[in-house]
């Protein structure tokens, strides 16, 4: 390919819409162009990158025994209604684009394909003799993101590889799950990414176990916690730890203490010289359940800890055996709309009476009471007295009549002691999720009534796994991890071209002829090469070459008459002046050892 024929439009200025480096570089280097909010065109250079990533993914999936297929992007609503996910994915802040056809039938644009593939498996996989089966596809997905951002990191349309496996036993599922784990590690290594596998929450997909693969980068949206001994890593949503010990309160009787204007933990502790770990703070929420019930929550947490919203949602779902569509804080405005008496925000205790919910228009009449382990373990503590500007000092759980359900509801954080090794502590890193694997169990096969006949002639639901890789996100994550001040530094395996021959002055016959000869020789050696034959200044060509990030560059310049060229490695900026034949030999050896 010649640059003179390539659709390459580079930008010198940073586009205002781009917040993170990788997004800026992909726009500036002419890889992508924004069409709408969260919608991008993949231009020729980017399409080559995506094709190379796809080739690696396809090779490793095939090597692991998976079979490629292609599923429809339009999904009948009935399938999602049968699984129980239609309401959660389309109502409120649901992420599924949905529409009606001209007959009024509801359809959704697939953000994921569990329902479709499980329905098909129920029709096609009748006997245990056909199992296990692992099917994958690579195609465009759609998600109605509330706030698309960061380019391809969080878009409304994106390319994804998703695989679904079907098994006759849980043991067989675990075996395939392990094989997919190894395949993913090979994929990310081959793509030149430093990806960390971490324990993860299963989220809306569900299932018994899941693991994310995170590319570590300062611009990552996710916080991951990693033990300093390297034996544990988890997403913040899932991470567990041993918190620091609470400061004990002095012995003494319970007393009520006026606290006018001290409605926050910070102001309360600063004014009274209390330690936040001595306080039980109480947070109120309303959870919208999948049966449209609005369930008030009363959650107790030690004052020096942060609540983990994902753990709260999971706790509600497990406790009530219902899905949670939404969970939002109760505010004074919210209580006013319910037409109930004012709640003493800033002075709420864990024994707040259900009476405050009397007369609520749509809420359930009682709280679901939950407490984090850090709060429940306190022998004595400070808490709100359920009256404005009043707190109780040295109270205890024995004085609380309605005991909460105790669970892990807090955020683990850097510096916490690890549960697996008391000598190890957690550290924080930012990460970009590029892959996620799940053991789904029988969640979907039971809901979809999809199963097989076992060796005893009885019908039972499939054991299932699912395995996703964000192909387009992976491409941008690679840029986030591999760039410098001048532009992108693509890993060779996924670069749009392996090498670029830059002719400094194409109007110089000697330079032009040597450039053409090098280009032809590299093509003959099966090198994926680009020739910059434009009638541009040499400085422009060098800047563009740095910006687009081709791993190797051969510069044909003023020494062309002597047969000397420069061989430049983009990632290290190492420059070697060599006879052209030696430069070609060195390059081929580096690319195809």
Swiss-Prot record:
Pfam families: HGTP_anticodon (PF03129), tRNA-synt_2b (PF00587). It is an enzyme of class 6 (ligase). It is found in: Cytoplasm. It comes from the Bacteria. It catalyses: tRNA(Pro) + L-proline + ATP = L-prolyl-tRNA(Pro) + AMP + diphosphate. Its EC number is 6.1.1.15. One of its GO terms (molecular function) is ATP binding. One of its GO terms (biological process) is prolyl-tRNA aminoacylation. Belongs to the class-II aminoacyl-tRNA synthetase family. ProS type 1 subfamily. NCBIfam families: PRK09194.1, proS_fam_II. Homodimer. Catalyzes the attachment of proline to tRNA(Pro) in a two-step reaction: proline is first activated by ATP to form Pro-AMP and then transferred to the acceptor end of tRNA(Pro). As ProRS can inadvertently accommodate and process non-cognate amino acids such as alanine and cysteine, to avoid such errors it has two additional distinct editing activities against alanine. One activity is designated as 'pretransfer' editing and involves the tRNA(Pro)-independent hydrolysis of activated Ala-AMP. PANTHER family: MITOCHONDRIAL RIBOSOME PROTEIN L39/PROLYL-TRNA LIGASE FAMILY MEMBER, PROLINE--TRNA LIGASE. Consists of three domains: the N-terminal catalytic domain, the editing domain and the C-terminal anticodon-binding domain. This is Proline--tRNA ligase.
């Amino acid at each position: 390919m010649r640059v003179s024929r390539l659709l390459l439009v580079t930008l010198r200025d940073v586009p205002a819409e781009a917040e993170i480096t990788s997004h800026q570089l992909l726009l500036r280097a002419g890889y992508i162009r924004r069409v709408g909010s969260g919608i991008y065109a993949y231009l020729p250079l980017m399409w080559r990158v995506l094709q190379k990533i796809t080739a690696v993914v396809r090779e490793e999936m095939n090597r692991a025994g998976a079979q490629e297929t292609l599923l429809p992007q339009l999904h009948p609503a009935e399938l999602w209604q049968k699984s129980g996910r239609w309401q959660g994915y389309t109502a409120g802040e649901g992420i599924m684009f949905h529409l009606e056809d001209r007959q009024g039938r509801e359809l959704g644009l697939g953000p994921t394909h569990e329902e479709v593939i499980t329905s098909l498996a129920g029709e096609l996989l009748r006997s245990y003799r056909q199992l296990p089966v692992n099917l994958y596809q690579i195609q465009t997905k759609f998600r109605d993101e509330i706030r698309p951002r960061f380019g391809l990191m969080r878009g409304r349309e994106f390319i994804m590889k998703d695989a679904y496996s079907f098994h006759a036993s849980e043991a067989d599922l675990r075996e395939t799950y392990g094989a997919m784990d190894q395949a993913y590690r090979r994929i990310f290594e081959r793509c030149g990414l430093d990806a960390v596998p971490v324990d993860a929450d299963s989220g809306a997909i569900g299932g018994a176990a899941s693991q994310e693969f995170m590319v570590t980068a300062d611009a990552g949206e996710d916080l991951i916690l990693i033990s300093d001994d390297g034996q544990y890593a988890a997403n913040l949503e899932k991470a567990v730890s041993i918190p620091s010990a609470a400061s004990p309160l002095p012995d003494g009787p319970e007393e009520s203490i006026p606290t006018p204007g001290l409605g926050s933990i910070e102001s309360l502790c600063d004014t009274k010289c209390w330690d936040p770990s001595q306080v039980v703070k109480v947070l109120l929420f309303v959870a919208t359940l999948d049966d449209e019930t609005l369930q008030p929550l009363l959650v107790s947490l030690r004052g020096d800890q942060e609540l983990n919203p994902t753990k709260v949602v999971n706790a509600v779902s497990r406790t009530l055996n219902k899905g949670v569509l939404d969970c939002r804080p109760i505010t004074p405005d919210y209580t006013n709309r319910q037409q109930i008496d004012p709640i003493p925000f800033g002075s709420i205790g864990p024994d707040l009476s259900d009476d405050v919910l009397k007369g609520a228009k749509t809420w359930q009449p009682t709280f679901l009471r939950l407490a984090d382990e850090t709060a429940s373990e306190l022998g004595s503590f400070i808490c709100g007295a359920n009256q404005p500007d009043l707190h109780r000092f040295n109270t205890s759980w024995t004085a609380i009549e309605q005991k909460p359900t105790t669970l892990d509801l807090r955020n683990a954080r850097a510096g916490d002691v690890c549960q697996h090794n008391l000598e190890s502590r957690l550290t924080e890193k930012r990460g970009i999720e590029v892959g996620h694997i799940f053991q789904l169990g029988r969640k979907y096969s039971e809901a979809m009534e999809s199963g097989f006949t076992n060796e005893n002639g009885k019908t039972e639901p499939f054991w299932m796994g699912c395995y996703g890789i964000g192909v387009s996100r992976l491409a941008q994550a690679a840029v986030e991890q591999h760039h410098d001040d001048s532009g992108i530094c693509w890993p060779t395996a996924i670069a749009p071209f392996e090498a670029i021959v830059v002719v400094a002055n194409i109007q110089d016959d000697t330079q032009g002829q040597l450039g053409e000869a090098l280009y032809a020789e590299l093509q003959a050696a099966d090198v994926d090469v680009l020739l910059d034959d434009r009638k541009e200044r040499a400085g422009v060509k060098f800047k563009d070459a740095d910006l687009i990030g081709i791993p190797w560059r051969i510069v044909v310049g003023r020494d062309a008459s002597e047969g000397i060229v420069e061989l430049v490695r983009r990632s290290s900026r190492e420059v070697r002046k060599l006879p052209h034949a030696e430069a070609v030999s060195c390059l081929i050896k580096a690319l195809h050892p």
